[in-house]
């Protein structure tokens, strides 16, 4: 029996970060909106991620900056002090999110099921979803919608990207040939692939007359990595590292033919735009974290390393098992990456 048999008047979504997970959450939010169009929706989201979601219709977005500490928590509580929700969907297990939830008034506070709940989230909720059979994060999020009475459906996304964003992207696209976007950096250095690997792939793509574009955030580490990669290229690729905001990046991703990326936000943005993406994985199970509609395109060494570390297949390991080996991403070879590019018709 679902929690609601008719549309709730108001819902609050709590998912702060990161960009990829916010993309997953957006599919859930828009699915709920489609089924319950009269329900008033409020989403508490991270300050950075807000840049991707702004201007989406029929939802109130409240940004939270984790750098503000308790001051930010109290400010958020003050904004919501006169607001009462039918339910809070707490889609983030981080303790910080649970603390934020204390100041959100809702009859039902819904959290993850036993297998996916972490950092004591169960102490802050009064309802828990059923863990889905599928290990993917997005399916876990979709279980929140099902719990409140929204039938299952394939995820869809509609981001509010402006014509100015698309015009910005156009200046980097070569419309006379195919375009490859390489986003080489993850949020943690251990999840990055080899600089030499990216450079070799870029050189091979260039030999096949592909327009190669590099992107990254403005973070110093990421800018330095892109600089090192491009220094090994036998041509001059288009380098827009640190030069785009999230919406401009989304516009660019929507126009390229393929994205190559480790576990990162741009990989999941590609899924929202229907752009094929090759994800590179070693430390996290790609069946859980890879771009949702591109699981078949993954190049991964996770399974064999899980067998080495635990002596059993990943299907028998706890849901969020992260491997501990050193430099596992170095085991990813160039050949299977090129093989995926050929399979996807890049050349």
Swiss-Prot record:
It is an enzyme of class 2 (transferase). Its EC number is 2.-.-.-. Signal peptide: none annotated. InterPro entries: Glyco_trans_9, LPS_LOS_Heptosyltrfase. The keyword Transferase applies. Pfam families: Glyco_transf_9 (PF01075). GO terms for molecular function: ADP-heptose-lipopolysaccharide heptosyltransferase activity; lipopolysaccharide heptosyltransferase activity. It comes from the Bacteria. The keyword Transferase applies. Gene3D superfamilies: Glycogen Phosphorylase B. Pathway: Bacterial outer membrane biogenesis; LPS core biosynthesis. Keywords: Glycosyltransferase, Lipopolysaccharide biosynthesis, Transferase. One of its GO terms (cellular component) is cytosol. GO terms for biological process: lipopolysaccharide core region biosynthetic process. Belongs to the glycosyltransferase 9 family. Catalyzes heptose transfer to the lipopolysaccharide core. It transfers the first L-glycero-D-manno-heptose to the phosphorylated 3-deoxy-alpha-D-manno-octulosonic acid (Kdo-P) of the inner core. This is Lipopolysaccharide core heptosyltransferase OpsX. It comes from Haemophilus influenzae (strain ATCC 51907 / DSM 11121 / KW20 / Rd). The gene is opsX.
């Amino acid at each position: 029996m679902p929690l609601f048999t008719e549309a709730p008047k108001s819902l609050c979504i709590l998912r702060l970060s990161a960009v990829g997970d916010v993309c997953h959450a957006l599919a859930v939010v828009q699915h709920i909106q489609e089924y319950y169009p009269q329900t008033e929706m409020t989403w508490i989201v991270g300050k950075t991620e807000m840049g991707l979601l702004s201007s989406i219709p029929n939802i109130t977005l409240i940004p939270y900056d984790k750098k503000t500490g308790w001051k930010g928590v109290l400010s958020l509580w003050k904004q919501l002090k006169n607001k009462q929700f039918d339910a809070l969907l707490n889609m983030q297990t981080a303790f910080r999110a649970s603390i934020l939830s204390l100041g959100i008034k809702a009859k039902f506070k819904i959290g993850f099921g036993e297998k996916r709940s972490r950092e004591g989230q169960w102490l802050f909720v009064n309802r828990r979803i059923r863990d889905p059979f599928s290990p993917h994060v997005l399916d876990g999020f979709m279980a929140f919608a099902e719990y409140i009475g929204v039938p299952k459906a394939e995820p869809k996304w509609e981001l509010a990207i402006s014509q100015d964003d698309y015009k910005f992207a156009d200046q980097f696209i070569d419309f006379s040939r195919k375009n490859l976007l390489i986003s080489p950096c993850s949020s943690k250095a251990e999840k990055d692939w080899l600089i030499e690997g990216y450079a070799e792939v870029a050189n091979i793509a260039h030999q096949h007359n592909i327009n190669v574009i590099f992107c990254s955030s403005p973070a110093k580490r990421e800018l330095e990595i892109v600089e090192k990669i491009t220094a090994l290229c036998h041509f001059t690729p288009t380098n827009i590292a640190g030069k785009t905001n999230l919406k401009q990046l989304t516009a660019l991703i929507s126009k390229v033919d393929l994205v190559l990326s480790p576990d990162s936000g741009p990989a999941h943005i590609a899924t929202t735009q229907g752009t094929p993406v090759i994800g590179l994985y070693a430390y996290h199970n790609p069946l859980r974290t890879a771009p949702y509609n591109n699981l078949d395109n993954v190049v991964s060494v996770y399974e064999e390393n899980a067998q080495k570390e635990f002596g059993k297949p990943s299907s028998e390991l706890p849901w969020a098992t992260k491997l501990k080996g050193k430099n596992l991403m170095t085991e990813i070879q160039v050949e299977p990456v090129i093989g995926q590019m050929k399979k996807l018709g890049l050349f």
